[in-house]
Amino acid sequence: MNLQGNQYIGFTPSGAGQQVFQAINPVNGEKLMPLFKEATVEEIALAGEKASNAFQLYRLTSGAEKAHFLTLIAEHIEKLGDDLLQRCHLETGLPLPRITGERGRTVGQLKLFAALLKEGSWVNASIDLAQSDRQPLPKPDIRSMQIALGPVAVFGASNFPFAYSTAGGDTASALAVGCPVIVKAHPAHIKTSTLVASAIQKAIADCKMPQYVFQHVSAVEHSLNEIDLGKVLVQDEAIAAVGFTGSRNGGRALLD
């Protein structure tokens, strides 16, 4: 993944938008390069369509395969090293020890879900056998288990650039259960988000997962030709669930 400031619809960079924005260092007000293009309604629709198609394949992936996938995401995030930490520091103003700890938490979450997938009990499988001779009516055979819902939209949080953002708990849990993810990156730490997205894309390629199992879009709130990108994403017919961490007003706006 080249950091060109575009959306990433699968492995394909898409730069249809005309509006651009950039992160700003909150400590000194410096505008940080590069410029990033805002997504368009059409790009969001395409991402939803591709995620829906990917779901039909990804939902059938075994627990062991998904565990390997999550483990590789964690490893690729770690391989980003100090470049990731330094950029996050510039974009958020958070101290490096705090950022380093949060990266460790994020990597740990991914590995935790990988271990859970290998163990397997998360599906809560239940088998209630039939009793054909039960009176007054026979009892049917009833079996159940947890299954994936479909594509999930995840919104990055401003104050947790790793643990509640691109590869945070919402993304990790969705990918673990078999749901493709479309991340709406937080504009305050957009390049940090894009770097983490590149780690996920590398893991997808390494594992030969469907390329549209993860997609990454971005925009500044309320600037998408007066259409809120978040609402466009949430209202897309492909989206089955939403992971959001943020203000009450922001959450209510998406819910309503």
Q: Which functions belong to the PLM regions below?
A:
Residues 122-256:
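Rossmann-like NAD(P) dinucleotide-binding subdomain of oxidoreductase/dehydrogenase enzymes
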Residues 1-137, 206:
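N-terminal Rossmann-like NAD(P)+-binding subdomain of aldehyde/semialdehyde dehydrogenases
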